[in-house]
């Protein structure tokens, strides 16, 4: 029986671009069928960091932004602001290309599962305060994602690998279970195409809308 990689028809693009701001530093890259032509990073998560990294990416390259014919956008999880800025950047590329660019979207948890050779059953990442994303399922595939309370996620999936985030969690994670999120560990388009889906517009990953508790305070009467 053929494996999953051999049964999927690989798109043939001349100059694909990967835009991934799910972690710090942000990463942009030009993937090849197996591996990467080039990857650039930038510690600044704001729009200027994305432009700076992309500009460096295309230095001394035969093509430029106008030659891009595919974009792989990481929808998260990550900083909501950073993901929205990256989405705006990708939308600008799509608008200027006038239909010439194919858009694909992937989840960082799925791509992270391609970054290790270990046999894993789950990967976790920070969500909002007190909650965590948990991805389960096969590697090199689009897995199932759930949002669990932090204590439940850590108790039910004690062997998870973990992506780090800006917030600290209640317990210390063993160093051996921390997974470095690095595009260099991904086998280019071979892995990207297994975890990506086509999209019309980039949309940041947001499984739960933010909720705000109704204020029930009392305004003191004026004297």
Identify the role of each PLM range.
Residues 62-65, 94-105:
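Phosphate-handling active-site elements
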Residues 30-31, 37, 41, 63-66, ...:
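Recognition helices and adjacent regulatory flanks at domain boundaries
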Residues 70-100:
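DPxDG-like acidic metal-binding loop motif
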